[in-house]
Regions:
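A phosphate-binding catalytic loop at a beta-strand-loop-alpha-helix junction
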Residues: 143-155
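Hydrophobic alpha-helical segments, especially transmembrane helices
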Residues: 11-12, 29, 153
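Bacterial N-terminal signal peptides that target proteins for export
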Residues: 3-17
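Helix-centric, low-specificity signal for extended rod-like, repetitive segments
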Residues: 3-4, 21, 145
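Short alpha-helical segments used as structural interaction elements across diverse proteins
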Residues: 7-8, 25, 149
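Bacterial N-terminal signal peptides
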Residues: 15-25
Length: 200
């Protein structure tokens, strides 16, 4: 019969402890690597440029030919036009505005779409799909997509890229958060929309 001494038992316990710590560290490193990989995948899918300032706006997010931001004024749209901009997509309800944006945009010689997305209601998938289809219809011309603060515009970006690239829910939310989505309630609406599926 094999007899273990106190020193042997202590040595075994120390070895077990060291091995457990090693496995725990490996698990944490693996989880961190997976997170970095996930972030890298999202980053590789689209290249997001932060333009600061942009006309009279503090910042605008650019993804290829698309610009996403809060409410622009005439000077901002003039700057957009100077960059070759041709189209403006407004996601605000007309009742939110105290001026005629359609008239202002047309006076600048730009095309105009208005797809109202009420800020306090669930996001209507049909409206978001219509926005995505309009972006596709316009082709490669520079397009300025906006709402009041940029949150709804970031949701529109997520929907468009999900249709175009087949993003996962996590990828779509991540890209939105890096493109102006800061409001917690709007984030919840985006997740609910993606879970339900993009059906008209």
């Amino acid at each position: 019969m094999k007899i273990f001494t106190f020193k042997q038992n202590r040595r075994n316990l120390v070895s077990l402890f060291v091995w457990s710590v090693f496995l725990l560290i490996c698990a944490k490193v693996s989880a961190a690597d997976e997170q970095k990989l996930s972030e890298k995948v999202s980053t590789d899918i689209v290249q997001i440029k932060l333009l600061k300032p942009f006309g009279n706006l503090e910042q605008v997010y650019q993804i290829e030919n698309l610009y996403f931001a809060g409410q622009p004024d005439k000077a901002t749209l003039e700057h957009f036009r100077s960059l070759g901009g041709e189209t403006v997509i407004n996601l605000r309800d007309p009742s939110e505005l105290k001026f005629n944006e359609r008239l202002m945009v047309h006076d600048l010689g730009l095309r105009y779409y208005n797809f109202p997305v009420p800020g306090k209601q669930p996001v209507n998938p049909s409206i978001m799909l219509a926005t995505s289809w309009a972006i596709e219809h316009e082709g490669k011309v520079p397009i300025f997509v906006h709402c009041s603060s940029g949150n709804r515009a970031a949701v529109a970006l997520a929907v468009h890229l999900t249709r175009k690239l087949g993003l996962t829910q996590d990828e779509a939310v991540s890209i939105s958060e890096r493109s102006g989505l800061t409001h917690p309630n709007t984030r919840k609406k985006l997740i609910a929309l993606l879970k339900e599926g993009l059906k008209p």
